[in-house]
């Protein structure tokens, strides 16, 4: 319950900070040197001492290592925003390192920071970094690691890992897509076909997809779901190409889950004059000023509040309440996934009846009344059987 209270508090405090993406072949970083007299929560508030680490807040270093790059208006930017919010709250030194999707940089970059005593906590996202975290954490048992969007099945005593229940949010996105494609909405056609464009295949992306499929088919089992993979999270041209191709095959709504590459998918939907569904942040609102043409076709987004997750986990680590060696899953009940509904596009595109239906589905899902399947921990044969139901 304490963890959920912290989440609830930070939901109102975290602000989205977007930064431009840097190079792809060498790890790049952005460092924030917070005030050394920053305070902590609990009994030591105002004294600047973090008892869990035996240091003043300003002497603590927290580094965020991202598998890809900032500038995605999605999970990377949100994660960095969460780090910066926590740094402002506690006063520790913060650094964000971008790996640019280069797998050869994962282990050496983590080793560099694990061997440097100036860095007390290494936060890693997302699932593609799991094996590297496990390797380096075993090599450096005194270094603390926070891994999000992946589970450390080894239960290493210096690692806290967690998954977002993106399947739950994606289920709602699927329901939204199905409601539009079967309606008389201006951009809907008669094909009863929707799409999904993912970045690179991994467990987290499969979790999005399985939830999306189930959500679509909960409305109409005969809806055809086109599935395409970009192969990485940075190729915006490929993302756009796949969106245009799916539109040509009859899709009138596409769910984009592909990081920076997903911005290309959203642009492809706008070019093809079909609806798109964004991911992680409210991408309609985020893109409205910089790319209003693309934003105009985003009917909603499945948010995943990685900013809240990162800031909450760091806060718990500094407060001494994070259970190292354990694993958690946060979803609808924790307020970290859901649909972006508080914007003009959602309110104008969906009818009152559709909005009421979506509210009811979200309420039932949050209350645990719906059995939403998850790819996390699922047998691969079962997973493939479910994924095969997408195409009719």
What is the meaning of each model-derived region?
Residues 24-29, 33-392:
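A residue-level marker of the well-folded mature domains of exported/periplasmic proteins
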Residues 18-21:
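C-terminal motif of bacterial Sec signal peptides marking the signal peptidase cleavage site
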